[in-house]
């Protein structure tokens, strides 16, 4: 296995195939990931790598138009699990959510860690997840279950502790092939390119967002750069918390901790606790509701607030925990 030149679509896709096929050793994987991070990835390279990773993964068959909301990670903010919490609000609004995630790579608590701490059974078989999606309009697709080849990469990512192309690839390889997506990225230079990659991969409507205070979500402490995808067209703009009646906070007010601590933050938000954490969830859930329902962002913010205040989002979590545990016992 030789990675003599990390440029060009073919040279980039080949290592991904070899890594996913278990043919590369940890030193080679580390060298490839570090070099790609230093070079910066092109739209074509990322698309090729995402397609390569999808081909090595397990697909979940379903007949719903599903949405994914996810951040790349790698922003070093250590915020609580905003998009994971938002996914429960979005689903409560009648939008089918296939949340694809993993355990923490470059933070303390990944989506899988947080949901597990909330009581959700995260490692159901695809057929059981299909049932959960059909009954509840939400499911969690544990990356390790669907992208088993990631076992070759996970230890190296953990050891490196830096953002790599896999921070980007994870959100691009949803096993349910989501056609709607809100994706947060860790640097502004990725906003438009990632929108183009998502469109290349079949996303019809979506938003790629970057909080200008280095947050891979819509920020409550700074303006957010957005590139919106509408059937192959792209619109770039900037939004601020004030536009939606939100008060800015500091990044520190959104810092999370262990999976248990982040799960507690999620529970408090869904129980109606007001404050910056709730507002961050509302804004990010609203982006997804705007994308899925094609309603103005202001209306989507009001809807997200209503879904929390009515208890519908909290009920969605309770149903999610109950059904996944029931199905896990049957396996």
Task: Tell where the protein language model's regions lie, with residue ranges.
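A glycine-rich phosphate/pyrophosphate-binding beta-strand-loop-alpha-helix module
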Residues: 33, 80-136
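Short glycine-rich or small-residue beta-strand-to-loop segments that form or flank ligand, phosphate
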Residues: 19, 33-37, 68-73, 288
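Short acidic alpha-helix initiation/capping motifs at coil-to-helix transition points
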Residues: 9-10, 24-28, 105-109, 278-283, ...
